[in-house]
Amino acid sequence: MNLSDVPLRPGSAELLPVRGVRALQAFDNRDWVAVEVPVALEFNGIAHAVMLATPTDLADFALGFALSEGILLGRNELYGVEEAYAPEGITLKLDVASAAFARLKARRRSMAGRTGCGLCGTESLAHVTRALPPLPEGPALSTRAVARGMRELASMQVLQKVTGAVHAAAWCSAEGEALLVREDVGRHNALDKLVGALARSSVPASTGFIAVTSRASFEMVQKTVAARVPLLAAVSASTSLATAIAEDAGLTLAGFVRGDDLVIYTHPWRLNGLPANA
């Protein structure tokens, strides 16, 4: 699947005047710049978080954020999302079930984040790494499928190709076909959008894997586990905390996925096609 010929989404980029220099010669030009705006999330009228995000796929973002943060236990706990636009930014007003609102109040957070900040304003260390049930075994996957998924993700990054400023996350089938892709200036936001899109779709999340264009930080691992996806493939490295969480949760974590090369940090048994040790 290749979406490189798809035009830019409305509101995702702006064409701005720039001053360029090439071979020591200055020139005037116009260039596409990714849009970044404050996006506030309200739950039943109570302000909860402000993220800096690309203003596309906002319904997916709202649902995915609430699911990956453990505020919602399922899509059925979200009754609706209203998008309110103002000069200073966008407010996503989520109407959630009373049980979900009670969970939110029990682990009160008030975040004002940098781009995609996943921890800003966390009031307790206990809220940083929350316990999640171990992942199911899931399907047998192959290193070839992981490599294919990362290639397809790269080919489908429409906004990144034009602006060079955004991350992307994709859900890929067991064969490596990238079936859902979301982009955002923040890596956490891109993954939240993907989690929301997965929840809205009929795709069984545990039958494939997630590929991301960033490092595998612990938040990315935690969000993948919360989405019940058994493998996370990242183009860059993992961290010590991300690796520990992946190990405990039964997540296969792969980093430095570039071409046919990759590094497997945890649970390599889930991947077929690994060469024998020399």
UniProtKB/Swiss-Prot annotation:
A GO MF label: sulfurtransferase activity
Gene3D superfamilies: 3.10.20.10, Cytidine Deaminase, domain 2
Keywords: Cytoplasm, Molybdenum cofactor biosynthesis
Species classification: Bacteria, Pseudomonadati, Pseudomonadota, Betaproteobacteria, Burkholderiales
GO cellular component, as recorded: cytoplasm
PANTHER family the UniProt entry points to: FORMATE DEHYDROGENASE, SULFUR CARRIER PROTEIN FDHD
Protein name as annotated: Sulfur carrier protein FdhD
Top-level taxon of origin: Bacteria
Species: Variovorax paradoxus (strain S110)
Alphabetized InterPro entries for the sequence: Cytidine_deaminase-like, FdhD
Gene: fdhD
Role this protein plays: Required for formate dehydrogenase (FDH) activity. Acts as a sulfur carrier protein that transfers sulfur from IscS to the molybdenum cofactor prior to its insertion into FDH.
A GO BP entry: Mo-molybdopterin cofactor biosynthetic process
Cross-referenced HAMAP family: FdhD
Family, similarity comment: Belongs to the FdhD family.
Annotated localization: Cytoplasm
Pfam families reported in the protein's UniProt record: FdhD-NarQ
Active site positions: 117
Residue ranges the record marks as coiled coil: none
